[in-house]
Amino acid sequence: LDLNSRAVQFAARNARWNSLSNITCLQGNLFEPVRELRFDLIVCNPPFFICPDPDSPVNQFRFAHSGEEGDSFCLNLARQAASFLNEDGFFHMMFSWIQTESQDWQARLAPAFSGLDCDVWCLRTGEDSSEDYVSGWCTDLLELQDTDFDALYSRGLAHFQKHKIASVGTGLLTLRRCTTRPNQIWFDEAPDDRSEPYGSCVANLFDLRAKFDSTPDELFLREKFAVAPDIATIEKSAPKDGRWEVIASELCCDSGLKYTFSGVDPLLSEIVTRLDAQASLRELLTVLAEERDLPLSRVMVTLLPKLRELLRYGFIQPASAPHLSSRPSSASHPSSR
């Protein structure tokens, strides 16, 4: 779908060139051409630039800017898309949004993504100060037409200051339709390394968070977990008393969304290596507490929040996960290198 007829023509030509027959290219505004249809997957790369100078000729370049003020176009687009999804269907979009000094970016976006009958995950990939954003916008515009950079920059920055725009955030938005329970909204910083495909990772984290975020500790302790594939430990050591001593440790994921988990202490490291998909978390924590001669309550208070966080970012998985359920009990986990 595209409003631009040339874009539709190019897409159709590329489909024919690559012998793809299962693609339909339609011209129209937003969802109007498919208003009677529902989808399992919607992927969108909208014109998400936030124009610092609404009166600028840049508005003619609709591939970059919607022509609407601020970030309302993309926020409204996401709200519309939610109603075009089948149950468990996904919507993916890259977009930018306004950030102000008076309000946290997550608090500002949350109302826009509420009441959609969808779980929502927003990953911030970066942010630019108002000065940097306006400067970059002016530089890009100069490549398209002869413009007075200084005058354009001054107008753009004045517009941002007038509307109290301190910075512009950019990121990825994913919705998954779910009408059978209360929905959840998650905001995160994206990992720096997104060089590999991570679609399956996104789907997996939706499943994990939807199931376990609201699970009481008592039920969480009954679960059996294992270290997820492609997890490694990176340790930093320093010389002390004639030997190397570990002074910092972190877990990292080598595939998908390559998150890292810093500040891994010896107690957390040990319990993670013992996750074998065979014993419950309570059983493992009980044994660890006895071996360390520590009160079980203290071990649980210390480790449970960290283990929940590891689960939310995919470092550990429930034993019922498809890629773990067939793993033999003697399998070793890639928890260190």
Q: Which role fits each region the language model picked out?
A:
Residues 3-12, 17-146:
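S-adenosylmethionine
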Residues 36, 67-71, 166, 261, ...:
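Short, solvent-exposed loop/helix junctions and linker helices
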Residues 42, 169-171, 312:
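A generic structural signal for well-ordered coil/turn residues at beta-strand boundaries
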